[in-house]
Amino acid sequence: MFNRRQILGTAFAAGTVALTGTALSGAARAAGWRDKYPELVLGIVPAENASGVTDRYAPFVEYLSKELGTKVTLRVANDYAAVIEGQRNGSIHIAGYGPASYARAVVTDVKTEPFCTTVNSDGTIGYYSVFYVRNDSPYKTIDDLKGKNLGLVDPNSTSGNNVPRFLLNKLKIVPETYFSHVTYTGSHENAVLALQQKTVDVAANWWNSEEDSNLSRMVNKGLAKKDDFRMISKSDLIPNSPYAYLTDMPADAKAAIWKAFEEAPTKAKVAYDKLSDGKDREFKAVNASYYEPVVELIKFIDSLRKQKS
């Protein structure tokens, strides 16, 4: 379990792409919460490009529809904020957040409740923020990159913005003055592509292991070559991303949703494995206290912005 001092060493709706699961179990269409929720919307932050997320989640959406006995629609948001706002206005019932985007929702009073996260294949429950450079570049450390171009992911990305900013602050670096240009690329895939195309000189990304990272997924899809990139920095462990449902949903609906997630690795192994290219072991129950260190991180990042303004 993480504590506040372990995280990071010291402190640690917009346009969408929709996919609907239609294979409903007749027996499951019983009266109760399903009458109030004839459709559930699962909103996912765009860690990769929309088509990739849609392909990854399609079988899982079908499984959820069947298990829950109500139509489940997938929404892949254009940016992280769209998922936050979707839960704020009640149009997204279940959200697949990053830790920081969930924390941003909490800080801005969205009534959302994390119920599970993923366990990695090695049993750990976390991942890392890394900085990549091109392998053919001369850069070895952040010190070598003054005046160069930095590629981040999204203002509400944990490993793609907030943790990198925290780490740079520890080095007494203000990104907007240290680097020639800071670009939000929109997704982890886009950050790597920007580095590949030499639009940026260094890019932030998520990484779990050599076999499990955004870069390894891009390699598997033929979008990048592993040997073209080199890691120059890695953060301390960050809690894995949460799934969260609306706080005001009925208790029996919440229980049914968690049960469907919990049983997915055995009841729908192919669909479950597709979510992570087979790199995750299971879903694990969590609650809001698990992400309190990340909420504190977001408050810290906000305080830095206020100081600079």
Name every feature range the model reports, one short phrase each.
Residues 1-15:
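N-terminal secretory signal peptides and thylakoid transit peptides that target proteins
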Residues 40-47, 144-160:
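Short loop->beta-strand "edge-of-pocket" segments that line small-molecule binding or catalytic clefts
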